[in-house]
């Protein structure tokens, strides 16, 4: 099973690199030739227009154009194999100055984009879509419509070179651990996906126990008579004047918290979700997501997240990512700084009179409140820095939210969080102020900054904080009910969201790695590989009373999850390098790796080009060996831990170019091409 998955993964990965290196593309003789162009007036169901009422748009192609006002208009094309294609419309949109929502359906599955105002013919990018082998129907539906279509072009997708993403931290003073983690992320990006799982925070996954405080004996005891150590600094008094300790600790080190409702002690099962992953797949995720939302100045309480993060990295060798659901008072106008508030009177949503712009204005209560928020956060991050724990830090996430509800696509009217409800300008100022305070005021340099982006329209790129302000960009995928491309209305959505992946890649000109920082359903491995959706990592949200994102069969296909976790494509906790956080500033001495190219200091003289596994024959397993050696050097490289790692002879054989320019993914593709008789090795 795993061997078969590896072979399929290798083929898909290698073919994905073909486009970025300018290599061949195959077209079946009886299939549509690409790029394919069709005039708007020739679409099925279209009518011929030469002007939009009194508005003329000159220089159209063909006899005229069509105007999307009534029913669907469509065309069909044949493709030789499942794959990704780009749809471009040469069109115009003169109805709405703020842009107009448009829908293209591919075999009934809908994709959406906002088309800007254009009173002359303009190329509108509808993104990448997956077409299936054989006949495909592409339709433009009149949901909002009123788009003029001169012609439509369908092209084979051109995949950008993912290797140009930087592993240089935006913080010039980044800690060695942060630098090392970034370099590792870069080493697997575009070749593998890292598994992740979000952990619940605060009072989540509360488990009730039989432990009670006995005032007569002054002990915490459970129904079996086991005694628990009282936290002497946690004594308090209830409304009836009875003393009790808020916390006690069991023989196994578990801390329990007093429940005022039931007068017993409870604990939070923060490991519930990763244990579920272990149960379903036999593996633990490599990344665990945390949140600092409990450290709000209104009700700050220590839920132990910092200690759990230290344990995850220093004891388990796992990678930490963290978001910051920081709350503000719902009625800021009635709030006195320092006043404690119940959680119910605070929010992280946009339903507050908190003026976000005032976080940058000295003398305002918002400015001082934000300072308290950052102080609480920094106190936790400093403990992590002192413990040598780097963090993929994702503050102010999901900034854009939904598309704007006004004519200004960047005004924040679609945002659902307070930090972005006042638009892109204020959002970027807030991001910069947080980053500057953490780095300059608190001396925090263990953070790998990650920004959430969406792809509702070309204006979505306006939310990007800039190359010098973030290290990664990410997308949060929640689409089991809406925005599906599989024709279903419920159940797990295994779509890879490839179009969005490459939209985000385009926003940053390929300079940053792109992750799926949150998700409901994990995309299927086959979708990711066939579509070349090389997300850096995935990270499902946690199980809760509201939604069972991990265990719920309406969110996850557990068979697909198991197959992905046990494939060579997916990196799990046990596959992370033992020295992951230790070599941020140290060069590699055995091999040299640059942009996916591996060279060795010495090479054997007897070379059988392409025979990477040294079995005296050239086949697809050699391509697999090359890709494994490049993607996971600690396991399959020259000194890898796996018994089947590549040897010096294998590395020499794998370099299929006579110029001996080092081993790259292009060599894996060359092996595949030689296997099917397209070329002869070596390459001259």
Task: Please name every model-derived segment.
Residues 29-178:
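Extracytoplasmic
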């Amino acid at each position: 099973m795993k061997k078969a998955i590896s072979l399929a993964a290798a083929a898909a990965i290698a073919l994905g690199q073909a486009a970025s290196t300018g290599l061949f593309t195959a077209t079946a003789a009886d299939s549509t030739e690409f790029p394919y162009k069709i005039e708007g007036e020739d679409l099925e169901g279209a009518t011929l227009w030469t002007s939009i009422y009194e508005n003329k748009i000159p220089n159209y192609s063909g006899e005229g154009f069509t105007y999307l006002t009534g029913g669907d208009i469509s065309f069909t094309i044949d493709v030789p194999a499942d794959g990704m294609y780009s749809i471009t419309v040469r069109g115009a949109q003169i109805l709405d100055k703020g842009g107009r929502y448009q829908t293209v359906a591919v075999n009934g599955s809908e994709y959406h984009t906002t088309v800007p105002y254009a009173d002359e013919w303009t190329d509108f990018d509808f993104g990448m879509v997956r077409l299936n082998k054989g006949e495909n129907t592409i339709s433009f539906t009149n949901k909002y419509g009123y788009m003029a279509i001169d012609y439509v072009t369908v092209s084979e997708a051109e995949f950008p070179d993912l290797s140009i993403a930087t592993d240089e931290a935006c913080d010039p003073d980044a800690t060695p651990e942060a630098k090392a983690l970034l370099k590792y992320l870069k080493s697997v990006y575009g070749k593998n996906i890292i598994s992740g799982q979000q952990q619940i925070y605060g009072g989540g996954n509360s488990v009730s126990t039989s432990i009670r405080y006995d005032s007569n004996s002054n002990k915490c005891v459970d129904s079996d008579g086991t005694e628990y150590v009282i936290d002497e600094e946690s004594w308090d008094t209830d409304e009836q004047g009875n003393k009790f300790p808020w916390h006690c600790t069991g023989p196994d080190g578990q801390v329990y918290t007093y429940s005022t409702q039931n007068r017993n002690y409870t604990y939070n099962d923060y490991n519930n979700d990763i244990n579920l992953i272990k149960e379903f797949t036999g593996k633990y995720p490599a990344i665990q997501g945390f949140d600092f939302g409990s450290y709000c100045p209104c009700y700050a309480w220590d839920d132990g997240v910092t200690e759990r993060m230290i344990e995850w990295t220093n004891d388990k060798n796992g990678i930490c990512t963290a978001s910051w659901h920081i709350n503000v008072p719902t009625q800021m106008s009635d709030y006195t700084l320092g006043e404690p508030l119940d959680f119910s009177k605070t929010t992280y949503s946009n339903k507050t009179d908190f003026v976000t712009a005032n976080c940058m204005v000295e003398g305002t209560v918002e400015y001082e409140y934000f300072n308290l928020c950052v102080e609480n956060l920094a106190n936790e991050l400093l403990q992590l820095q002192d413990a040598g724990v780097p963090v993929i830090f994702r503050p102010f996430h999901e900034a854009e939210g939904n598309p704007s509800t006004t004519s200004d696509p960047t005004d924040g009217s679609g945002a659902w969080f307070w930090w972005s409800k006042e638009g892109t300008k204020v959002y970027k100022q807030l991001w910069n102020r947080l980053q500057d305070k953490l780095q300059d005021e608190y001396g925090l340099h263990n953070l790998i900054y990650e920004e959430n982006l969406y792809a509702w329209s070309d204006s979505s790129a306006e939310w990007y904080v800039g190359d010098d302000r973030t290290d990664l960009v990410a997308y949060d995928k929640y689409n089991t009910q809406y925005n599906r491309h599989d024709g279903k209305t419920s159940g797990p959505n295994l779509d890879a969201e490839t179009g969005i992946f490459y939209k985000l890649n385009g926003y940053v000109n390929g300079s940053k790695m792109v992750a799926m920082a949150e998700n409901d359903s994990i995309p299927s491995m086959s979708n990711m590989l066939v579509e070349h959706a090389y997300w850096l990592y995935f990270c499902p949200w946690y199980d809760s009373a509201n939604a069972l994102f991990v265990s719920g069969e309406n969110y996850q296909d557990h068979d697909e999850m198991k197959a992905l976790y046990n494939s060579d494509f997916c990196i799990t906790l046990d596959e992370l390098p033992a020295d992951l956080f230790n070599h941020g500033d140290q060069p590699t001495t055995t091999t040299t790796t640059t942009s996916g190219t591996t060279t060795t200091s010495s090479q054997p003289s007897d070379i059988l080009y392409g025979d990477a596994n040294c079995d005296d024959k050239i086949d697809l397993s050699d391509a697999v060996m090359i890709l494994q050696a490049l993607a996971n050097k600690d396991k399959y490289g020259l000194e890898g831990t796996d018994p089947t790692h590549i040897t010096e002879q294998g590395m020499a054989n794998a370099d299929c170019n006579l110029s001996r320019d080092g081993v790259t993914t292009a060599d894996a593709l060359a092996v595949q091409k030689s296997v099917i008789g397209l070329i002869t090795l070596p390459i001259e």
